[in-house]
Design a protein with these regions (language model features):
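Glycine-rich P-loop/Walker A and Walker A-like loops and their local beta1-loop-alpha1 context
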Residues: 2-66
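Conserved P-loop NTPase "ATPase switch" module shared by AAA+ and STAND
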Residues: 128-144
């Protein structure tokens, strides 16, 4: 019987092999024939296991002839907050402020002039014909932004295969359950990989 630690490894490796197959034939396997956007779905408790495997998976994708580029949503969020000039003020007020107020202020920075979406679009637009973008740290969007809002805003702006590493649960062909916290959302139209275990 496999140890509890090895179960996520097997599930994650199966999902990664499924992703490689999808990336090898993206047009045939995208049922909605939309932008080349994919969700690599895994259970939230496997976040660290995915992070540990990411460098190895990037190496495998390189061996497959791709040019993988990692784009961290955590880095983008931090940069946008830093550029807002509000970081120091928030740190000073943090002990007095209600968490909901701080979250709302961060949400406003990310949404103002579509800052988060535009920054993501700019990062995924860079690269060559064999580029694959791996969009990581999706879990850090909670509670500021929903991933589907980013997907919807990126329609027509995804020139390279882009894989969103999504901690949650897959429900059918188009449904996702983010972090096991939010209700199921059945309106995703991109290709979903993994997340059925």
């Amino acid at each position: 019987m496999p140890s509890p630690d090895s179960v996520p490894l097997e599930v994650l490796e199966r999902a990664f092999q499924e992703l490689r197959a999808v990336l090898g034939q993206p047009d045939r396997l995208n049922p909605a024939h939309s932008d080349p956007l994919y969700y690599f779905v895994y259970r939230p408790q496997h976040v660290l296991a995915v992070k540990r495997r990411l460098a190895g998976w990037m190496g495998i994708l390189r061996n497959d002839g791709f040019e993988p580029v990692r784009v961290s949503l955590a880095d983008i969020v931090h940069e946008l907050i830093d550029e807002s000039g509000r970081w120091e003020a928030w740190l000073e007020l943090e002990h007095e402020a209600e968490p909901g107020d701080v979250n709302q202020a961060i949400r406003e920075v990310l949404a103002r002039n579509r800052a988060l979406v535009n920054c993501v679009a700019e990062r995924i637009a860079a690269g060559g014909p064999r580029t694959i973008v791996l969009l990581t740290e999706d879990e850090l969007l909670h509670p500021y932004f929903r991933t589907r809002a980013i997907e919807s805003a990126l329609v027509g702006r995804v020139p390279h295969p882009t894989v969103i590493f999504y901690p949650g649960r897959r429900v059918g062909q188009y449904g996702l359950h983010f972090l096991g916290y939010y209700p199921e959302d059945g309106n995703y139209r991109s290709t979903l990989v993994g997340g059925l275990e």
